[in-house]
Amino acid sequence: MLAFCRSSLKSKKYFIILLALAAIAGLGTHAAWSSNGLPRIDNKTLARLAQQHPVVVLFRHAERCDRSTNQCLSDITGITVKGTQDARELGNAFSADIPDFDLYSSNTVRTIQSATWFSAGKKLTVDKRFLQCGNDIYSAIKDLQSKAPDKNIVIFTHNHCLTYIAKDKRDATFKPDYLNGLVMHVEKGKVYLDGEFVNH
């Protein structure tokens, strides 16, 4: 009888441990994947990826002035003062882990301003190919990467570009908010989507 009780208690103990492990695994899965099905890549994970191969991070621009009641920075087609603060905060966090990158933006005021505030003085190259997005965006990314194959790349673009890439590469429905981003890389001439960038 005593042996049975000990066996029963032992079984319950193992069961509780298994439940705890399952709960932890569930939390890890929740943290690792977005609700849209894209892997979540935080700053530290991005830094580890960048050690394996150069990364390409595409961000949507900051809060646009013409769709907000917040104070405009300057031009109504640009971003808000809040947008500049958000872009600078994101840039500081990003640069702490990925200090070396080439910076690009599409040829709109809002993306140029976002990239400028994000980078805090880094040289910016404006490239109109990141305004109208479709399959050609991959050629543009590969072109930039081929010019500096060992450099990380940051591109400020638009929500429709990010939505297109997520759907095309992973069949994911991605509706990016301001300054949301996607992480990609180029390998053997092909562009791969690694996941959604999460700033924390």
From Swiss-Prot:
It is found in: Periplasm. Pfam families: His_Phos_1. Residues 1-25 form the signal peptide. GO terms for molecular function: phosphatase activity. Its EC number is 3.1.3.-. One of its GO terms (biological process) is lipopolysaccharide metabolic process. SUPFAM superfamilies: Phosphoglycerate mutase-like. GO terms for cellular component: periplasmic space. Pathway: Bacterial outer membrane biogenesis; lipopolysaccharide metabolism. InterPro entries: His_Pase_superF_clade-1, His_PPase_superfam, LipoPS_heptP_Pase. Keywords: Hydrolase, Periplasm, Signal. It comes from the Bacteria. HAMAP family: Ais. Catalyzes the dephosphorylation of heptose(II) of the outer membrane lipopolysaccharide core. Belongs to the phosphoglycerate mutase family. Ais subfamily. This is Lipopolysaccharide core heptose(II)-phosphate phosphatase. The lineage of its organism: Bacteria, Pseudomonadati, Pseudomonadota, Gammaproteobacteria, Enterobacterales.
